[in-house]
């Protein structure tokens, strides 16, 4: 096919001296070079700003989109172009009895479609309480869902041939909510500049997924729109749920004197649901000092440096980059096909790999570690910034020293333990 695309946008703008309004709609579509290989998406974007008072402003935005993707292309790469599409009888030309590489047959008969919905909403307020004190609060919400439909007919596809038709429906839904509130105080007293920030953030994430598989269809007319036509003894059902929370408190102090001497002190506390009750919270301080030597009178007299700045900093940061529930025992149910029947395996873990059509490699990863805690990294930095020749030449020197403690990693266990691996610090 000739690749074609379309992108249409319609926008409306309006407002008063206190309110501004914007609404736009968008439709986008593209057709790939392959048959039944395309993508389309439609949605709208709404933005509103309103000054309730001269010192109090609220904002709201909402973005919604709905997409659809068909993915059936790419098979022509593996097919010799000298083979015809149809034989003399008008049927699809087959190289042999087990020909699973006919791109046109597979594209026309196999189904692989994904439908998505995405929502991004945000609301915020800014309150200038006094000239030196401002309060900001934000709420952000993100929602996404997808439904993937696949059907492999009993002819022309390997998965369908071995299973007398194979259908799959996979659903996913995720929600992310973030709340932030910060207060900022900035004041100048003669040569003294003071800035203080305090804030609180809360983040919650939850996702749910489910999957249905059906095989050995009595009638393939409706494909996976009639999953009940599959052999009930071979049907597979799966589902899962993941939920995490992160809470943070932040404090920062900035001080400057005569635009020469600068200091910053930051302290934050983070609590993550990924760790056990005794190790959910960790504290991360940091500090920095700098000296703008080019603002000193004795440096100005040299008339060489446009900038000469010495700086030093030290800070501790944290990492919680592990999957949730690693501190808990996890039990799962898996099925594998053996000698013409499905066998259920129940154990403290989950399936992470396959070994072909006749079995599933079961790597149990469910052993708990309630003592897991934050990975921390301490870093110090000493540097010099130099600019000369009317800022035409910039020179930067930096010395870093970074040390990580309590590194989060997977430890491989001996097979005799009955487990595959465990997360440790």
What are these regions, as identified by a protein language model?
Residues 41, 47-56, 60-66, 98-152, ...:
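Extracellular/periplasmic, surface-exposed regions of secreted and cell-surface proteins
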Residues 1-36, 72-75, 105-113, 125-128:
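Residues embedded in well-ordered regular secondary structure
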Residues 158-159:
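N-terminal, polar/charged subdomain of small-to-medium soluble alpha/beta proteins
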């Amino acid at each position: 096919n000739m690749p074609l695309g379309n992108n249409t946008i319609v926008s409306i703008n309006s407002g008063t001296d206190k309110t501004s309004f914007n609404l736009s709609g968008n439709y986008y579509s593209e057709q790939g070079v392959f048959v039944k290989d395309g993508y389309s998406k439609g949605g709208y974007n709404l933005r509103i700003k309103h000054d309730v008072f001269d010192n109090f402003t609220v904002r709201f935005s909402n973005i919604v989109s709905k997409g659809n993707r068909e993915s059936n292309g790419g098979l022509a790469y593996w097919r010799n172009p000298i083979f015809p599409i149809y034989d003399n009888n008008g049927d699809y030309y087959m190289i042999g009895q087990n020909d699973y590489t006919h791109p046109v047959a597979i594209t026309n008969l196999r189904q692989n479609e994904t439908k998505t919905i995405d929502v991004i909403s945000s609301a915020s307020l800014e309150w200038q309480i006094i000239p030196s004190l401002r309060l900001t609060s934000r709420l952000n919400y993100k929602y996404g869902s997808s439904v993937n439909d696949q059907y492999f007919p009993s002819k022309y596809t390997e998965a369908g041939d071995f299973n007398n038709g194979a259908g799959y429906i996979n659903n996913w839904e995720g929600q992310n909510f973030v709340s932030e509130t910060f207060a900022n105080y900035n004041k100048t007293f003669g040569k003294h500049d003071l800035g203080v920030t305090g804030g609180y953030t809360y983040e919650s994430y939850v996702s749910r997924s489910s999957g249905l598989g059906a095989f050995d269809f009595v009638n393939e007319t409706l494909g996976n729109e009639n999953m009940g036509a599959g052999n009930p003894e071979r049907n597979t059902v799966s589902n899962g749920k993941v939920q995490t929370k992160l809470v943070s408190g932040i404090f920062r102090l900035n001080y400057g004197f005569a635009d020469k001497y600068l200091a910053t002190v930051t302290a934050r506390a983070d609590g993550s649901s990924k760790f056990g009750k005794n190790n959910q919270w960790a504290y991360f301080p940091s500090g920095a000092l700098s000296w703008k030597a080019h603002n000193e009178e004795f440096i100005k007299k040299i008339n060489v440096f446009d900038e000469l700045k010495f700086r030093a900093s030290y800070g501790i940061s944290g990492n919680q980059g592990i999957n949730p529930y690693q501190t808990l025992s996890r039990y799962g149910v898996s099925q594998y096909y053996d000698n013409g029947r499905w066998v259920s395996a129940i154990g403290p873990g989950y399936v992470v790999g396959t070994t072909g059509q006749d079995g599933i490699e079961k790597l149990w990863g469910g052993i708990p570690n309630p003592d897991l805690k934050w990975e921390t990294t301490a870093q110090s930095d000493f540097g010099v910034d130099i600019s000369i020749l009317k800022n035409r030449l910039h020179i930067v020197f930096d010395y870093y020293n970074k040390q990580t403690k309590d590194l989060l990693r997977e430890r491989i266990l001996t097979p005799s333990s009955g487990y595959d691996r465990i997360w440790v610090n």
